Amino acid sequence: MKTSLCLMFLLLISSLGFSQTYEIGGFVGGSNFIGDVGSTKFVNPNKLAFGGLFKWNRSPRHAFRASVIYSTLSAVDELSSDPRRKLRGYSFKMDVLEASIGLEFNFLDFDLHAATPMSTPYLYTGISMVNHPNFYFTTTNLVSEKTRSNAYGIPIILGFKTTLSRFIILAFE
């Protein structure tokens, strides 16, 4: 998968109806394309990414997690530091939708039922799928195939979360 959704800023809102065993929330961050078109910088968010998240907290140390992220990916060779890419002049813009399921592991106990403030670093991994349009470059143009495909990946996310109040959790990934 040639996309990178990075520097995610998550705002997770615990659900009151489930005694904080389940969490629902949203997040916003940045995205950028990593590939053979555009910038050669690995972390260089240039478009907005946003999505939703659901978690089932099985214990103070782990949770099952599902998320959906939407973003527009774009790349422009003229903005690259590579003179060959600048000379070539390719560019593209496309909308992508990513879905992910997996396991989140807390390095410290993160008990949502505790009355005291909690904080912990965490690790998330699982499987993700991105739906994207298919296209190819000719020597002068970007040509759409008018079809879409799925790409699969294994996300590895390191984050930190803390309780802001009894029902609000703030997390950074």
Each model region followed by its residue ranges:
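Residues on the lipid-exposed face of transmembrane beta-strands in outer-membrane beta-barrel proteins
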Residues: 26, 52-56, 101-105, 125-129, ...
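Short glycine/proline- and aromatic-enriched beta-strand/turn motifs that initiate or cap beta-hairpins
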Residues: 18-57, 134
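Residues that define the transmembrane beta-barrel architecture of outer-membrane proteins
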Residues: 20, 44-48, 95-99, 119, ...
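Outer-membrane beta-barrel transmembrane domain signature
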Residues: 118-173
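Extracellular loop and loop/strand-boundary signature of outer-membrane beta-barrel proteins
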Residues: 34-40, 84-92, 141-146
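Repeated loop/turn-to-beta-strand initiation elements of outer-membrane beta-barrel proteins
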Residues: 22, 61-64, 111, 166-170
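Bacterial Sec-dependent N-terminal signal peptides
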Residues: 1-24
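Gram-negative (and chloroplast) outer-membrane scaffold detector with strong preference
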Residues: 62-138
